[in-house]
């Protein structure tokens, strides 16, 4: 279903909501999915992704980190912002794991 929908011509007026789209995908397939999603955004569409994969999270324009735990321990907004901003929030489990990835990417770019 996902590949069929994403292969349609983008109108620039569509809201895409994806729940864990990387589940079961190979790393290369995740990379291809990210290319498609970023292309949809570049064409003016809005893409909302519910995801735990840090390779996807680190490419987001904006993150809403909900937690801090799952189930009864969750449901609160822990952090919002760019990946860099979320990585600076001590209460964010996502930020804690995201920070080293962002640091490594910065070091590789230098």
Curated annotation (Swiss-Prot):
Domain of life: Bacteria
Gene Ontology CC: cytoplasm
InterPro entries, A to Z: P-loop_NTPase
Keyword Magnesium: no
Keyword Cytoplasm: yes
Cellular localization per UniProt: Cytoplasm
Subunit structure: Forms a heterotetramer with UvrB during the search for lesions.
Name of the featured protein: UvrABC system protein A
Gene name of this polypeptide: uvrA
């Amino acid at each position: 279903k996902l590949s069929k929908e994403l292969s349609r011509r983008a109108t620039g007026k569509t809201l895409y909501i994806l729940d864990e789209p990387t589940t079961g995908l190979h790393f290369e397939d995740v990379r291809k999915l990210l290319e498609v999603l970023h292309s949809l955004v570049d064409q003016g569409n809005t893409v909302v992704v519910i995801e735990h994969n840090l390779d996807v999270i680190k490419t987001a324009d904006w993150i809403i980190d909900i937690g801090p735990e799952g189930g009864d321990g969750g449901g609160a907004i822990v952090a919002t912002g760019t990946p860099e901003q979320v990585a600076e929030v001590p209460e964010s489990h996502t930020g804690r794991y995201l920070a080293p990835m962002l640091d490594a990417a910065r070091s590789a770019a230098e």
